[in-house]
Structures are given as structure tokens and as C-alpha cells.
Amino acid sequence: MAVLFFRSAAAQSLTSILLLLAGCRLAAPVAPAAVAGQFQLGDGDRILVLAPHPDDEVLGAGGVLREAVEQGIPVRVVFLTHGDSNEWSFLFYRKRPVVLPRAALTMGTIRQREAVVAAEALGVPAADLTFLGYPDYGTLGIWRFHWGSRPPDRGRLTRARAVPYSTAFRPGAPFKGEEILADLETLILEFRPTRIFVSHPADHHPDHAALYLFTRVALWDLQGEVAATLHPFLVHYPRWPGRKGFRPAEELSPPARLLAGFNWQTRGVNEEEIAAKRQALTAHRTQWRYSASRLLPFVRPNELYGDLAIPQLRPGGAVRLLEDPVGEQAASAANDEEGEASELVDLHGLSVKLARDQVEIGMDLREPLPEGSAVSLSAFGYRPDVPFAAMPKLEVRIEPHAYAVRDQLRLRPRSTAWAATRGRKLMARIPLASLANPDRLFLQVRTSSPRTPLGQTPWWIVELRAAPATQQAAMDGSSTSESTAAAADVKAPW
């Protein structure tokens, strides 16, 4: 998967890198799931839409919101950020680049007003909108680096370290992970949704991936109090949703590369909802002026949602999370105005094995890892009896002849984890104790060169069913109607 950067010559020079967990002979990957038909809203539903930025609520769930209003179903829309750091908006709307923090704050206020007008086009009153005000383009960094004793993050353009908007849900809230999590848990517990429409974990925009991750943790924390089904919607993905422009007769379908590992559903959007959705998008004037051709392809006769199929691993079990045997994940050039770049080059797969007291991850490269390049593995654990802010958040950086382990940028002893390169094979082993003996594990792999980030996988979730001697807290089931895939008992590839 790729981050939002223009693809450079340096990145192109590394197009030989491919990540394939050493699981070619492991258990079958999480099975591809065809779109499992349509779902319908019904009596008793309560709809919560979690949008990373103003306009995402329309792109991902505009039809849902319109139908819910027509049926008298309660709705609430929550915006993670004000979208105040989109420099293209300044160039096209203000006809000049942003140079001062106050200009970014002004843009955030404008985008909030646009969201109110867009909601009115869908029939949603302003009283049902909540704006959190966290930093645009910054929330994935908060997820990775800003918990507990770590200082708050700083807004990219606003330069703020706390929510700077007086109209936000909690003005002055520090830009830290536990603050975002607390806000989401408060709002979810207050509204008690039955369905949550949220951004997708495979989305290439960092705020979109981050909002899904925070939402997952919030729902786990609220297990037993709130039972809601997640409906993640995809927005930023290479060469998807296809041709630009208004295509009201062509249905959305999942990217072929995301069929495996996700359970997809769709719902129909009627002509009246299509018209309302388009009108709502035009209300986001700062975005419409420069990217109407990117927004319109989401106005279709259906809306599409696909959640992670979460595998369960028992000791000795292994699973492939991704598989692309014919190399369809080859990189592509940047494909939109925001600099949405290519996939992780030639990504074939990602696999995980659970040993009795450690988790083992291996990666295969087409060629040995070039000098100056690195592969980084993130592993964040979750368990219900420890605040997530206090859980280790490990990042293992693997270079051709060395590795280092950090927890929120703090260097940790090498005994915290083990990693090595052997020709085209990369491998890492992390003791469960280093992860505080989690019940669930977030995993991600990234590649980088000296001058430019190259790419990243989605964040994946694995449930760990450890042996009694190492398992600290058993969790059976989830409030989010998760689908799980069993992993076979096989030997580690190394």
C-alpha cells in the first residue's frame, strides 16, 4: 500500500522490492469474499457516520444518510478533522498557497460551514453534526507516536498542539491518542449506534486509516455496552473507483486487490438519493472547485462497504493476510491531485505465525534489500484490562545488516524483538511479553528509501488465542460482528 506522496525517481529505482511473507507454503490466505449482496436499514437502527474530513461523509455514506432521514432513523455524523491542511484547497479556493496558521484555521472553519450545508442537502440538521477538530493529515502520526507520556502532536499547517476550534466537541483537547479515543468512546456510548459507517483500513489517506483503527479500539473498549456493526468505506485507492466523472448507472465494486481479506457488502442508492448526494458534494465548495472529477465517481447506484476478515491464531497456527501471486500490486504513478501515490511495489502477501510465546513475521523480497533501504514492521497489541495508551506500540526497522526496535520513537533494547535479513528473506520475531501479552494485534509493514517513503500495507488485525501459560485475558467474540478466518497449524517457514 502507498502513502500520499508523489512517486519519485528514487521510488522507481526500488520497484524491484516486493514483500511476500515467507508463507508461500503456509495456511491459505484469508479467503476472498465476493460482495455478499445488499443490506438494508431497518427499524431499530441508529446510524453513526465517522468521517475523517468534511466531504467523506457524503462520499462514503451520503445515500445511507438520506435514506435514514427519509425513514426517520436517528443519525449522527462525527468529523475527525476540519480538513484544514489541504493545500490544494487554498490554491483553488483562495488562489494562493497557505503561509500562516490563521489561514489554515480559516479554511477549517469554512469547511465546517460547508459540511453543515451539505448535511442540509441530505436532510441532516446541523444539531446532528459533531466536529472533533484533530489535526488534518496528522491522526495516523498520533496513532503511532503520541500516547501516554509522549507530547501532543502538532498540526501540519495550524501549528496547534490542541483542538483550536471553539465550536469543536472538546476545544483544547491535546493532540494525543487517548484524547481521540476518549472522544469516540463518549460519542459512541452516548448515541449507541447499531451501524457505524467509517473510513477503510486499506485507504491510502493516513487520516482514513487512523479513524478506522481508533474506532476499532473504541468498540473493543465498549464491548458489552454497545453492539454495532462496522461498515468501512473506501475513498483513496490507486486506479479506483475507475474513470473520473459522473457515472450514476455504473455500480461500485471492490478493487480486485482487496477482495481477499475483506468482507464486502453493498446497498442500493435510488435516483432521489443520487441527486441528494450530488447536491451535497457541490456544497463542499472548497473541494468541488479543484476535484469534482474525483468526487463524482462516488455518486453511483450503490454504496460499498468492506470490513476486515479477522483471523484467529492459536499456537502453531499461521495465516497469510495477503496474496497476489501474479504481481497485480505493481506500482503505478501518482493518480490524483493530492499526490495519491502507488502501491507498495509488487506486494504479494503478508503472513503471521503464533508460537507459544512469540509472534513470528517473515517477508520475502524479489531481490535482497538494497543498501539504504528499510522495511518497518509495526505491532501494536490490545487487551481489555490494560488501557490502550499504556500498551506497547512497537516498530521494528529492518535494514540490510541491522535492525532497531522503538516504542513511540523511543529506542528499546534489542531483546525486545529479533529481526534479520537472509538474502531475499526478512523475518521478525516478537515475544508476546514485549507486547504485554495481547489478545489482539494490529500489524502493518512499510518500506522506505533514503529520500522518500515508498509504500505501506493496510493495518491488519489478528486475534491471538495464546496458550494458557501466556494468555492473560481471553476474549471470545466482539461487539462489532467480526468475521474470522481459522488458520491451519503449520510449521514456521524458517
Q: How would you label these PLM feature ranges?
A:
Residues 1-14:
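Bacterial N-terminal signal peptides that target proteins for export
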Residues 11-25:
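Bacterial N-terminal signal peptides
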Residues 24-191, 216-232, 236, 261:
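Active-site rim/loop-helix segments in enzyme catalytic domains that contact anionic ligands
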Residues 31-33, 140-152, 158-173, 183-186, ...:
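C-terminal accessory domains and tails appended to enzymatic cores
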Residues 184-203, 208:
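Proline-aspartate-enriched helix->loop->beta-strand connector
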Residues 224, 367-374, 434-439:
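A short beta-turn/strand-edge loop motif at beta-sheet boundaries
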Residues 313-321, 377-404, 423, 432-494:
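Acidic/polar low-complexity flexible segments
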Residues 357-367, 426-430:
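Short, well-ordered beta-strand segments enriched in hydrophobic/aromatic residues
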